[in-house]
C-alpha cells in the first residue's frame, strides 16, 4: 500500500486500535519492538503491547465486528470505514475515480471495494460488505 493511501486510510478511519494491530502484523516481531533500546526506557513503548491488547478487544470481536457498531449513536464510522476500505484496498483506481468515491454515496464506495478484490487491512477491523 502506498504511503499516501495509508495516511488517507488513517484520516478517514480514525481507528487507532486498528492501526496498532496492523502495524504489529507488519513488524518483524513484537518482542524486539517492545524491548528496543531506541525508546530510551524499559517497558512498553508508546502504543506497544497495550495497544495491541486494546485492538484485539475493540477490533477483533467474535464475528469480526468492532464494538463501535453496537452503539446506535455512532453511525458515522460506517461511512468512513467503507471509504477507508475503498482508498486502502483499491490503490489502482485512478485519481478521478477516487474523487468520485469520496463525493458519492456509500453504495458506490462498496461497489468499488467489491471490484477491488481482497483487502490488505486486518480482517477484524472492517465490517463485511
Curated annotation (Swiss-Prot):
<feature type="compositionally biased region" description="Low complexity">
    <location>
        <begin position="26"/>
        <end position="36"/>
    </location>
</feature>
<protein>
    <recommendedName>
        <fullName>Uncharacterized serine-rich protein YubK</fullName>
    </recommendedName>
</protein>
<keyword id="KW-0732">Signal</keyword>
<feature type="region of interest" description="Disordered">
    <location>
        <begin position="26"/>
        <end position="76"/>
    </location>
</feature>
<feature type="signal peptide">
    <location>
        <begin position="1"/>
        <end position="17"/>
    </location>
</feature>
<keyword id="KW-0614">Plasmid</keyword>
